[in-house]
Amino acid sequence: MARYVTLIRFTDQGAKNLKKSPARALAFTKAARQAGVIVEAQLWTLGSCDGVLILSGDEKKVLRCVAQLASLGNVRTETLPAFEAKELKAITG
């Protein structure tokens, strides 16, 4: 199963409604699960990103979930494929 790291940055709307972020995160986790995507971790951060998601599942399902999340207008996302050492070794030979 493929794994992805999604970097989260709040929009002005998302920052304005920061107190609602945990409830939105729970709703995302439930929707992702229903779509066949596993949310391995959901973390809020300080710095250039406001949060990080670690997701696993079929590429199209993961990207669909992330696109739906961004379409709500509270966050902007950047999704990166992620690999463990043995996966990278298999890719690079």
Feature-to-residue mapping (PLM):
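A compositional/biophysical signature of low hydrophobicity enriched in polar/charged and small residues
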Residues: 1-93
